[in-house]
């Protein structure tokens, strides 16, 4: 049964107390109206217990914002949620529309640093987060008498003439009274030849989850700093500090130990506020994990990023013989749970 305001309620008890379920929780759809954001569609989801998040069909069904009782879970950048028409796929152009948010998807043909591969140029993190969705549907319904489901689903396609034809369907779901959400992806190669498939969930936690009073808790059995800068503070990868102008980003590659159910749970906990956020995902789907730690003023964010391949360029992955391929007609699924603690 849904738990609202500290009490469990049956379906009938809730029906008697409101004219429609939207009074308690549900989805509102609207478009942003100004500047680079004009025309961006948002599905604003409320679960009824203070947990709220925004899914953007215009931006790969990614999660542009999330909060709990008015406290943000994620970092939002200065770019805003730019309309995908402004996407610049060359070099670092991806950053001009990187709004942060609770989830930005990287892939699907490439991710990591810009590169050249077989005469093709691939920009930073590829175009997944800039793919607009079609067949967008909203579900708000009871599953029996015990669970009221709230979900948004849409389908994106990464394709071109003489190129890949990949269909990607995403469902973002929660339930009335919940303090977490579930992202489920189904990716199908509808072409007739194999194609690369790399996917990384760029989950961007921000203030007040991220603060000088926060710690990162994760089942990391090995931490490999990306470079010399990260190596200088590798011993304190799990501690955060106050934001300061000019601090460089630090990235760490973790080897995670899944639990008895094959799941990995990572979380950030603000010890002073006794408030935080978590992610949980199947290790078999995402055997690689990157931590993006930046305490630069204005870019105060800690990214927790599971992926299906090492985080490096497509060209490097190919050279390492580590580039995942999706065969013609093959389907692959990925999922993650994100929520409040």
Task: Show where each model-derived region lies.
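Aromatic side chains
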Residues: 201, 251-254, 289
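Surface-exposed beta-strand/loop patches in extracellular or lumenal glycoproteins
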Residues: 199-205
